[in-house]
Curated annotation (Swiss-Prot):
Residues binding ATP, per UniProt: K117
Gene Ontology BP term (one): nucleotide metabolic process
Cofactor(s) required, per the database record: Mg(2+)
Protein source organism: Neurospora crassa (strain ATCC 24698 / 74-OR23-1A / CBS 708.71 / DSM 1257 / FGSC 987)
The protein's name: IMP-specific 5'-nucleotidase 1
Family membership noted in the UniProt record: Belongs to the ISN1 family.
Amino-acid biosynthesis in keyword set: no
Stretches assigned to coiled coil: none
Reported regulation of activity: Allosterically activated by ATP. ATP binding is a prerequisite to magnesium and substrate binding. ATP binds to 2 of the subunits in the homotetramer inducing a closure of these 2 subunits and the release of the C-terminal loop, thereby activating the enzyme.
Gene: isn-1
Residues bound to IMP: D157, D159, D165, T193, D349, K357
Catalytic-site annotation from UniProt: D157, D159
Keyword field contains ATP-binding: yes
Pfam families in the cross-refs: ISN1 (PF06437)
Amino acid sequence: MTTRYRVEYALKTHRRDQFIEWIKALLAVPFVLYSQPHGVLEDPDRSVDTLSQTREEAHRRYSEIFRDIEAMIDDHIAHQNDAENPFPSKLKLLVPSIGPFFTRLPLEAAFKFQDNKRYISSRRFVSPSFNDIRLILNSAQIMAVTTYGTLQLATFDGDVTLYDDGQSLEPTSPVIPRLLDLLRKNVKIGIVTAAGYTTADRYYSRLHGLLDAMANSADLTPSQKQSLVVMGGEANYLFEFDSSSPHLLAPVPRQHWLTPEMAAWNEQDIAQLLDVAEAALRDCIKTLNLPATLMRKDRAVGIIPVSPEIRIPRESLEETVLLVQKILELSTVGRSRRVPFCAFNGGRDVFVDIGDKSWGVTVCQRWFSQKEGPHGVIKGENTLHVGDQFLSAGANDFRARSVGTTAWIASPVETVELLDELAELMGKKMS
């Protein structure tokens, strides 16, 4: 029983998104009922009409399901906005892990958009997949932030979102002109990355393509150029664009941007939490015989491969994340919850950071709100965070869901497609 529990929970549940899995299960029913895999054996002339009818019926049933989920989300939003209602929404009962929604989600329209691109209703052997639903949710979210309100802030993860894992944002990257287009539309940009560098030169080496393009742009106003910040170490180091700086980024003193809640974090608690994490990581290196070395920073501690050529197995990284996270949660300083932390799998390494991306995105919201004055407050419904790690454990974009809308991508190519979709929707709204 213990072994089965460990397999089912520790190795599988943390790699799933309950909301997406629930939608996937709902869509499996019409797929089973209306797909026609035997059509490949029928007479071609007959099968064309049959498949067309089947596709239309599957599309209709899928659309109905997304319309019903859309209504459930509306009901969930009504419940979360009613502080006096003690009862959970129907969606909360069906998907207990569901969190807050900052906007409505036009899921039916988003499904029809993605169905035209991915031909989901035409498939006979492959049911609507996790990735299909993830992209439908992305489309619904960017439809919402451009239709029901105004996008004021877009924040991005670094690795796997803006550039490939371990690489840099090169001048030839197709992401760059799309980010510049957002700046021209007066959308603020925050790059919220786990990379915990304390100096501007290290961030310049990762982001030089974008920073140089901004510095050399003739059609960006000084105000628009000031609309980019880099938040490093999840929520620990803030840099703003500065064309006069040698590395085009200027560090912002911590006392200028810390939120009142972050300013209350005790340095002794931070040191104690990192000490516990360090001991747990050392134990993992020994127990799992990891080819890794420990790295301690002022606001983070982690393990990295002993040489760049070595890749630690994914399962070992996940085991390390889950073990360290559990040890921290059960520790005295962890139980006190005085200092938030994030244990995450970086793909090649594992780190524990003080704070998490919900704090990083919050700092970006407040930083730009302060610059805009009392009428420029950036709320969750006006914020879009784009990242690749949204699973419930070992994923550092997950907690950004608590402070703004999100889009879950799987590669820089998907980021480009998302930004193109966003630009088209923003263009329609302005026209």
